[in-house]
Amino acid sequence: MNLHQTVEHEAAAAFAAAGIADSPIVLQPTKNAEHGDFQINGVMGAAKKAKQNPRELAQKVAEALADNAVIESAEVAGPGFINLRLRPEFLAQNIQTALNDARFGVAKTDKPQTVVIDYSSPNLAKEMHVGHLRSSIIGDSISRVLAFMGNTVIRQNHVGDWGTQFGMLVAYLVEQQKDNAAFELADLEQFYRAAKVRFDEDPAFADTAREYVVKLQGGDETVLALWKQFVDISLSHAQAVYDTLGLKLRPEDVAGESKYNDDLQPVVDDLVQKGLAVEDDGAKVVFLDEFKNKEGEPAAFIVQKQGGGFLYASTDLACLRYRIGRLKADRLLYVVDHRQALHFEQLFTTSRKAGYLPENVGAAFIGFGTMMGKDGKPFKTRSGDTVKLVDLLTEAVERATALVKEKNPELGADEAAKIGKTVGIGAVKYADLSKNRTSDYVFDWDAMLSFEGNTAPYLQYAYTRVQSVFRKAGEWDANAPTVLTEPLEKQLAAELLKFEDVLQSVADTAYPHYLAAYLYQIATLFSRFYEACPILKAEGASRNSRLQLAKLTGDTLKQGLDLLGIDVLDVM
């Protein structure tokens, strides 16, 4: 159920009865549970508009909410707020419904969409590094939530598998007579660094590299064979990282830059024909009045370089056309570093003008900040090098396994390793997903692996705590009437019934930290409930009802963490 909508519906009827039907209700959860479950804040604005006393108008709304099947009490507070407390019977009935629902009371959207989500998208011929972590796990979580809410989700891994870097690599390998040798990703990285130096310092080598790019684009069999080898090695490495992270990305989701090679010139020609792209100093450029350069002139969105070469803009335009025309997207999401914001704003604007992006199709740039070290600078190794993602994840598992062994010395090596992997990978992912994605965040091993506070280990332990209750519970009846008498029983029940509200918010806004904050709230609330309301020592209907609340808490934590891409354990 959508608890917010249910309460808002009741409030709307009360607003109508008070003569302010057209006024915004402004309903939000109370910050202090002692004041109730929800608060209406819209009366003051309505009173100002109607030139009425806000408290008197609020009292009319509160009186209209009397004898309500959903709301137990409505109390006016302050200058015109209305605090709402939900009926225990209403909460109990919906707890029962959620317990008997495989989706825990979360309804699918009544307006499902086909959502194409672009995430991870590393450049190939080099190892993935920490800079790829945020896009990969943020995109994965958003895609999970969208799919769970009933949308058709098409994941697209837009890898950088085309362009100058591959011409450089081919030129270097031919020069070094290694073009027929077998090599691994580490070799490619070494070759790439050497090729980049040659490219920057030797104009003749740079010309040769560009010639190989032309050959690659023209379908030269020898160059294509080398290119395919580079790509296969890189993608195999990337998939291993995705599997370690537990991402939903699969090889069939890869749709790299090379996929759109044949569409680039037609896109540029179409923009020229439509009068959008014009020649400027030999290049093809779309000038956008919506964006200004430093001189206050329309910004230039370059779609073809002088000499005929293509850019990210060309590829992204062709890609966007494909996703709407062939994949039939209703909504496009691009999970990319926040520094690319202007590029995507210009891409969307150009696409709207060209008719590639219809008004009924949404397109959003899902930007994110930088992972920082404790020194406040972008996260690096001690020597200042980029941290390889494989190394980071290996260290996470090793640190978590050591912590698990320290807490449970009796555990066997295999069991400790299994728990350590689940805790370590979960900790890295949650440390990111629990933060507002638009912000930078500090990578801190001690904080993320702590079993206290807003961390994955804390939530995973909360889940195991619930499971331990049921190992001792014996027989109980999940279908017996739920009875809520204690304040913390009612508070936990009300919070559990907000699951759909939170998931819909994540689906709408693409902010996974809303879900993380909700799960942490559930876990901390359950801890307070567990201490104040004995479960196994209670008797009769009270014992059974508390077990029902515990069961739904465990189910919600497990499902919610899964939507963040984090596993749980029955024992830790």
Curated annotation (Swiss-Prot):
What is the protein's name according to its record?
Arginine--tRNA ligase
Do you know which InterPro entries this protein is assigned to?
Answer: aa-tRNA-synth_I_CS, Arg-tRNA-ligase, Arg-tRNA-synth_N, Arg-tRNA-synth_N_sf, ArgRS_core, DALR_anticod-bd, Rossmann-like_a/b/a_fold, tRNAsynth_Ia_anticodon-bd
UniProt xrefs under CDD domains: Anticodon_Ia_Arg, ArgRS_core
Keyword match Nucleotide-binding:
yes
User: Which UniProt keywords are present, listed alphabetically?
Assistant: Aminoacyl-tRNA synthetase, ATP-binding, Cytoplasm, Ligase, Nucleotide-binding, Protein biosynthesis
Organism classification, top ranks? Bacteria, Pseudomonadati, Pseudomonadota, Betaproteobacteria, Neisseriales
Give the UniProt subcellular location, in the record's own words.
Answer: Cytoplasm
Q: Where is the signal peptide?
A: none
- PROSITE patterns per the UniProt record, alphabetical: AA_TRNA_LIGASE_I
**GO annotation, cellular component aspect:** cytoplasm
The short motif 'HIGH' region is annotated over: 122-132
Major site of localization recorded for this protein: cytoplasm
Gene Ontology biological process? arginyl-tRNA aminoacylation
The answer on whether this UniProt entry bears the keyword tRNA-binding reads no
Q: Fetch the SUPFAM superfamilies from UniProt.
A: Anticodon-binding domain of a subclass of class I aminoacyl-tRNA synthetases, Arginyl-tRNA synthetase (ArgRS), N-terminal 'additional' domain, Nucleotidylyl transferase
